[in-house]
Amino acid sequence: MYNLRNRSFLNLLDFTSKDIRYLLDLSIDLKKSKYAGIEVQKLKGKNMAIIFEKDSTRTRCAFEIAAYDQGANITYLGSRGNQIGVKESMMDTARVLGRMYDAIGFRGFSQQTVECLANYSNVPVYNGLTDTAHPTQILADLMPIEEHKGSLKGVKIVFCGDGRGNVANSLLKGCAIMGLDFRIFAPKELFPDSNLTLKAKSLALDSGGKITITDSKEEAVKCADVVYTDVWVSMGENNWEDRINLLRFYQVNKEIMDMAKDSAIFMHCLPAFHDLNTVVGKDIFDKYGINGIEVTEEIFESKNSVVFDIAENRVHTIKAIVVATLG
């Protein structure tokens, strides 16, 4: 049996294509079992803490439902109501929680923080998001690509927008490892780190994949199987004017989707600013006249959109990670 027991899930570069393939297959099996009502609980008696410096809907719910479905107990530690970083360092917190819990999930700012948790807790630690990486999201992205396209190898996927964000960075790694034809369509100012790009291209040579970083719409989008985008301003940032000026021509709209294949699917990790039904969306419209920021309402609500498949798959993929490393 494939063994990932006691491994932390911090960075996709820590894992091989076989590791990721195993986790995807387990995710699919767990999803089928849940729908069939025959899921076997493998985490009875286990206790997990999740530390969230950044608020979340999908990530928190996915961790909690994954734990409940598998019979584990879970404790949520938010940005308020604890002493982490105020009266107690993360190093000391890690050593305390490691004595109490069997695993720890983290969603926050610094990659160094989640690595500190893993180094000092001596239990598996799962990265639910940092400023530079979002590895659990990428498993949830790869799963619907395979569900809708039949396989991963050679699938052409283009990411439109901020090429240096945590989702773009992690997609770059995951697609390179798993052999996809991955393109980033972004302004040169927001190209990913050159060292990361070189690493991804090296991995793609081994996997049969391909990496393209470009500000050419035609080069990036033509004949794409998957079109992906993310918000233009990350949590904790507030530079909307600069981003809109830089990225307004990288919005996913009908023109972009018409350049992709007719069968292309649209993906977004959520939350998405696609209408005027949020405070941010309305504020941006009032200031800049943009209805829909990184994606238009037309594309978000189209038959090609699989955004809610991705959201659901967060449960199954996080569950697979926890079961594989703790069960």
Swiss-Prot record:
Give the GO cellular component terms, alphabetically: cytoplasm
Q: Which residues bind L-ornithine?
A: 166, 230, 234-235
Tell me which InterPro entries the record gives: Asp/Orn_carbamoyltranf_P-bd (IPR006132), Asp/Orn_carbamoylTrfase (IPR006130), Asp/Orn_carbamoylTrfase_sf (IPR036901), Asp_carbamoyltransf_Asp/Orn-bd (IPR006131), Orn/put_carbamltrans (IPR002292), OTCase_ArgI (IPR024904)
- Residues that hold carbamoyl phosphate according to the record: 56-59, 83, 107, 134-137, 269-270, 314
Pathway(s) it belongs to: Amino-acid degradation; L-arginine degradation via ADI pathway; carbamoyl phosphate from L-arginine: step 2/2
Q: Which domain of life is it from?
A: Bacteria
Could you tell me which PROSITE patterns the record lists for this protein?
Answer: CARBAMOYLTRANSFERASE
Q: Which GO terms describe its biological process?
A: arginine biosynthetic process via ornithine; arginine catabolic process to ornithine; citrulline biosynthetic process
UniProt keywords (A-Z) are: Arginine metabolism, Cytoplasm, Transferase
UniProt key word Transferase: yes
> What family does the entry list?
Belongs to the aspartate/ornithine carbamoyltransferase superfamily. OTCase family.
Q: Identify this protein by name.
A: Ornithine carbamoyltransferase, catabolic
The organism is Borrelia garinii subsp. bavariensis (strain ATCC BAA-2496 / DSM 23469 / PBi) (Borreliella bavariensis)
